[in-house]
Amino acid sequence: MSSNSFGKLFTVTTFGESHGPAIGCVIDGCPPGLALDAAEFGHDLQRRATGKSRHTSARREADEVEILSGVYEGLTTGTPIALLIRNTDQRSKDYANIGQQFRPGHADYSYWHKYGIRDPRGGGRSSARETTMRVAAGVVAKKWLAERFGVTVRGYLSQLGDITPAGFDWSAVEDNPFFWPHAAQVPELEAYMDALRKSGDSVGARVDVVADNVPPGWGEPIYGKLDGELAAALMSINAVKGVEIGDGFASAAQKGTEHRDLLTPQGFASNHAGGILGGISTGQPVVASMVLKPTSSLRLPGPSLDTAGNVVEVVTTGRHDPCVGIRATPIAEAMVAMVLMDQALRHRAQCGDVGTITPRIPGQIDG
């Protein structure tokens, strides 16, 4: 069956194409009584939006949310919440020359062989434009998690090309267009991206997400493990080619004495596992990372094929991001938040009455 829906109890279905008249989503399973106003979507949507700096696509969309259902007098009613955003800055003529050509590194070839038809305008359904509605749904999940459990979900760009942060400060993340945690490096990133854009090439990136105050117990072994669903959610984002939970692939070089997260009455001594053991949250910060490939939308010509199998030279015109990772932080946050809300509701449904005599310990030792 088609896979345009996400989640089990907190379910999100997105629809629409990059250059269609609108994009939207239907959120089902949100508990009633959550205060919700259209203006609340603006902050995260603008964090994801294009046209905010010279380092992202020049496409400018207002991204104003219309709430069509599921909210009455400012409160969710428990019925499906339908959200709509109208596309206003499509430039489909930029894609006129590639309607019968396959852009290397894009979903053109695979979509063509699956469906026998594709919408070439801006990538159609495979465009990152679709993630706008994930961010919108993530606003709902973030708010519910914060109000119900005090959970916060925050992300940052942890690598741009071969550049990594020289320091870390959460307060710096929202003060630059890269979501970078070390303010002193922003000029270096600006210069790097200016040179990259001038060359016509692109580059990959890495985004880290941290969810604080997640209670222990969320996750459904065996096939609904929290880390498994986080990995699937992050892998569903455009251009993502790798996901880590906690130390991830670095665990291969670690000894057990290093990787194990010791428990003490004062708290966990470390968090190499990323706050998840056995597929269940431990009460530590949940830490997930994703790596995004360099975009294949390049001004540099490259050989390819057309739908008839003829050799062609493809040059991608239009407005594109030289690094899709720059705008990916709010998307990753949204996916993590939606997984956590879905798992919270599922935990409440099955194990809401479960209690233990074991005291909860802090997620980490203070100091």
UniProtKB/Swiss-Prot annotation:
GO annotation, cellular component aspect: cytosol
The protein's annotated pathway: Metabolic intermediate biosynthesis; chorismate biosynthesis; chorismate from D-erythrose 4-phosphate and phosphoenolpyruvate: step 7/7
Chain positions recorded as NADP(+) binding sites: R48, R54
Enzyme Commission no: 4.2.3.5
GO molecular function: chorismate synthase activity; FMN binding
Assembly: Homotetramer.
PANTHER family (alphabetical): CHORISMATE SYNTHASE
Role, per record: This reaction introduces a second double bond into the aromatic ring system.
Entry protein name: Chorismate synthase
Organism: Stenotrophomonas maltophilia (strain K279a)
